[in-house]
Amino acid sequence: MTERVQVGGIQIAKNLYDFVNNEAIPGTGIEADKFWAEFDKIVNELAPRNRELLLKRDEIQEKMDTWNREHKGQKLDMAEYKAFLKDIGYLVDEPADFKISTSNVDPEIATMAGPQLVVPVMNARFALNAANARWGSLYDALYGTDAISEENGAEKGRGYNPVRGAKVIEWARNLLDGSAPLASGSHKDAAKYYIDGGKLAVKLQNGDVTGLKDESGFVGYTGAADAPTGVLLVKNGMHFEIQIDASHPIGKDDGAHVKDVLMESALTTIMDCEDSVAAVDADDKVVAYKNWLGLMKGDLEESFEKGGQMMTRRMNGDRTYTGADGSELTLKGRSLLFVRNVGHLMTNPAILLKDGSEIPEGLMDGLVTSLIAIHDLKGDGKFQNSTKGSVYIVKPKQHGPEEVAFTNEFFGRVEDALGLPRFTLKVGIMDEERRTTVNLKACIHAAKERTVFINTGFLDRTGDEIHTSMELGPFIRKGPMKQAAWINAYEQWNVDIGLEAGLSGVAQIGKGMWAMPDLMAGMLEAKIGHPKAGANTAWVPSPTAATLHATHYHQVNVFDVQKELANRQRASLDDILTVPVMEDPSSLSAEDIQQELDNNAQGILGYVVRWIDQGVGCSKVPDINDVGLMEDRATLRISSQLLTNWLYHGICSEEQIMETMKRMAAVVDKQNAGDAAYRNMAPNFDDSIAFQAAVDLVLKGREQPAGYTEPLLHAYRQKAKAKYGQ
């Protein structure tokens, strides 16, 4: 039984109450009694409004279901469909043209373009790795991944392979030639780098001395001018440092004693309290909030054993250089941090309201994470996150402008409660629900003084696409879905609306995750498409991926791209509204159907078993072909909703689903054989809470609000914690 403290009209789990009073509040200048009194007032006043917004979702969905049932199997008459959507309040009138007026935005968001990490804030080690991923070794990123082929003797092996090393160095020199070309010759022929009269001089192997073709690309250096240990360059706002050390194992054999190229990598990181964590009660929420506090104060540490030695990870300090003009230059050593709160749907037993109901978790997140961020705003921590006095909060899974307006109002209430200037709290709007996509301009307008990013998310957005139009017919397979007309239009529309609303130079226009952390060669080839599409940030699955993706922003000046795109015709709303149902379900072979069932069932089970049994909300889960995929609740939503849809429309039977689930459970068990903490699902399926959760996500998928997986996951995780004593 949870021990609780009664404060006014709320009952707070004692461990959360103690954490806030004894750890979060000291140093903020806020009085604990006043904080809880304001907290009580805000949540008890706004919780009913929160519930009303959720009821409106249900009412709209019921009307959609009825209309879709009546039009099943018919070709959509787009004029009729849009009139219906307007009639039920799904599609609202677009506001007149406007530009966002967000102020005090850090340059990493407003005027720079580069990779973004998303990490579970409950994992301190991951959080620290991400915070420190502002800078990364290009040599390590290339050597340790498939970005460099293992062909022709370039295998990774156990020790250092000089053949592979040579390929890494060649790749890096090519990057230097592209990002910092010399007036004559190539970086491959460099014999010495030095500073002469505030400019970079490069002595070549043939004795010639040259410099940069564009001298403004030289920013600063470390060490002595005539023998620098580091040369700092910049391309399209992204810094990179040629590191020189003749005594280093790599540097000693290099023509110019270059040991590495250090890349400015993850400009921003989202510390996630949402889709990548499993936080179902006060114990879990305290872990999340405590790590966020450590990040805001700069004192988060994590000790762990590696190779038989204890190591302690901490946040990196800033980087200091001598500038080209001789003055001291300091660059941030850490990624700029956002925090992602949960959306409007879930409640949490950590706090009970005056009517005994659980608190809307998003209200709790907003109040507590903002309180904690005061440590950064006051500048009394070890490091500064925002140099502009802002707090960056990502708000996911909002449906339409009314819900964004509610967030905007709530943030204002939080600012007043904490004594913060208006619009200190900035908002990142995830464009991952269909009603937000089609009303994106109105959504941005509802928070036009706070918006610092919009971001597309293919997986959640597809999950909502399926659930919204569940009754219309069976949906196409997950693979072809990525090429469907609506997705391309959705991705373009997000950029078009963002540019119309004046986000360029003020806020981020973001793109989604590369979900295959082991396939970096593929990422290097494909993900340049994101900056080319006008996105000034895009999600990557690891610090290594951030370093490699950073090279794309050297090749593409995103702000130039945005200027060009600002004049193109906006993407078609009709395309976005085109529902990707199958034209001819009978064309699917039995083999096609089973393959899709196997693939989705395996992904569902592989993710759910770790979520339920171990409380792991984000992990690299091997797919059916043993390719490691980064999975979070978004991937689970699309997989479960697709199977729900196929079952509902008779593409497959419940018996088929169960047979597939049981067979795939054995596959997942085998894939996890090396994990000592793992609990097998097969063959005692009735005893496996995780297996039951996975099955329910499919069999009860139509009943889940918007196809979200959280209600079932939370319920089953709480069961597992009770059963296993976690």
Curated annotation (Swiss-Prot):
Group of enzyme by EC: transferase
Keywords: Cytoplasm, Glyoxylate bypass, Magnesium, Metal-binding, Oxidation, Transferase, Tricarboxylic acid cycle
Pathway assigned to this chain's UniProt record: Carbohydrate metabolism; glyoxylate cycle; (S)-malate from isocitrate: step 2/2
Main location: cytoplasm
Signal peptide as annotated in the record: none
Single GO molecular function: magnesium ion binding
Subunit description: Monomer.
Protein name stated in the entry: Malate synthase G
Organism from which the protein derives: Marinobacter nauticus (strain ATCC 700491 / DSM 11845 / VT8)
